[in-house]
Amino acid sequence: MKPTPRRIEQLGGGWVAEEALAIGLWCALSADSLEEGVIRAVNHSGDSDSTGLIAGHFLGLLHGPEAVPARWVDNLELHDVIERIALDISLVPGGYRSDGSEASRAIWERYPGW
């Protein structure tokens, strides 16, 4: 069964965590593409930015960054900065150690705020 605005409303508005997670996950798992899932997740009258974010995260994990439509990214302000931060975040679990390693030094050079 595909999510529709009416069916989504039966789960709630997404204003609390369990509703937002249910809506985002349902939209992600029932979609044939990242675009379809995110659009479904935001086309309801509830907390659509949160449900869209959740669906987008799951769909990005499943399909990778190349699944994001180019027209969503092409004119995105600070695209290069966002992409660099995303890459750095992806390195943290495996490559970052606070032991002075090369990855650690590179992170501290880019984000020296501490």
Question: Across the structure, where does each feature detected by a protein language model lie?
Answer:
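Juxtamembrane cytosolic face of transmembrane helices
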Residues: E109-W114
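Small-residue-rich helix-loop
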Residues: M1-L11
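Catalytic phosphate/nucleotide-handling subdomain of diverse soluble enzymes
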Residues: E19, I23-W108
